[in-house]
Amino acid sequence: MDSRMSDLQALRGFLGGSERLFVLTGAGCSTASGIPDYRDGQGQWKRKPPIDFQAFMGGQPARARYWARSMVGWRHFGQARPNAAHHALARLAQRGQVDLLVTQNVDRLHQAAGGREVLDLHGRLDEVRCMQCDWRGPRGPWQHTLELANPQWAALQAGAAPDGDADLEGQDFSRFVVPSCPRCGGIVKPDVVFFGETVPRERVQRAYAALEHADAVLVVGSSLMLYSGYRFVQAAARAGLPIAAINLGRTRADDMLALKVSRPCDEVLAEVVS
């Protein structure tokens, strides 16, 4: 039996032996849906790190650059559809094997695939909120507002980047008009957790509560370089739970894993979860 088949057989056994899985997914789970990831096989940045919270809140130039790239990128991101990995994990949940699926992604593709008990750890890109009055709204109308205010930018074409961004280089972002909150005139931000921003406590508590009842942990498409997700794997290891990972390249928790399959998530899960 070759190593590939051996890994798949071992993963089938791992999943078959669990009744209360805690699943943690990252960007690699959505790459087959056409959404790029941030890191290479060594866990290093493939491109410039994303904007951080302080920069976004601290100045109009940073917000103009962010929203220009996001407006152009949303056309691609908003059309992404679940891939075989999302559908396989949804099947596991529908069978009652998944206590909670915690995703670091903001694309809502697990829900689109029919996933149950999904926790969007870092929020969701299909909603926006005001940082002053907490007004909230769907991304569709906000996208329309952005495009009406910036018709010349709306016609631009650019390559897709992670998390709904677009690769726009050499542009004069000072000419991009950033709309304000329709209720109070405040700063509008996507309802996602930026770098430098804290994950809401209730989400973290819900994840830890599910982990206490889990009998195994499955990591899908995450290098675990971000502490926001890595901490749950650390806690699982301390509790003696078996941990498996499907990920191309190294993870921060390689020394904690009972099993690792270094192949694309969609291919592996399509074969293992019938």
From Swiss-Prot:
Residues that, per the record, bind NAD(+): 26-46, 104-107, 221-223, 247-249, 265
GO CC annotations, alphabetized: cytoplasm
Cofactor descriptive note: Binds 1 zinc ion per subunit.
Cofactor: Zn(2+)
Keyword Thylakoid: no
SUPFAM superfamilies in alphabetical order: DHS-like NAD/FAD-binding domain (SSF52467)
Catalytic activity: N(6)-acetyl-L-lysyl-[protein] + NAD(+) + H2O = 2''-O-acetyl-ADP-D-ribose + nicotinamide + L-lysyl-[protein]
Record-annotated Deacetylase sirtuin-type domain positions: 1-274
Intracellular or extracellular location(s): Cytoplasm
GO MF entries: histone deacetylase activity, NAD-dependent; NAD+ binding; zinc ion binding
Entry's EC annotation: 2.3.1.286
Coiled coil: none
UniProt keyword Zinc present: yes
Keywords recorded for this protein, A-Z: Cytoplasm, Metal-binding, NAD, Transferase, Zinc
Binding site for Zn(2+): C130, C133, C181, C184
Active site, UniProt feature: H122
Functional summary from the UniProt entry: NAD-dependent protein deacetylase which modulates the activities of several enzymes which are inactive in their acetylated form.
NCBIfam families in the cross-refs: PRK05333.1 (NF003738)
UniProt family annotation: Belongs to the sirtuin family. Class II subfamily.
Name by which UniProt lists this protein: NAD-dependent protein deacetylase
Organism annotation: Bordetella bronchiseptica (strain ATCC BAA-588 / NCTC 13252 / RB50)
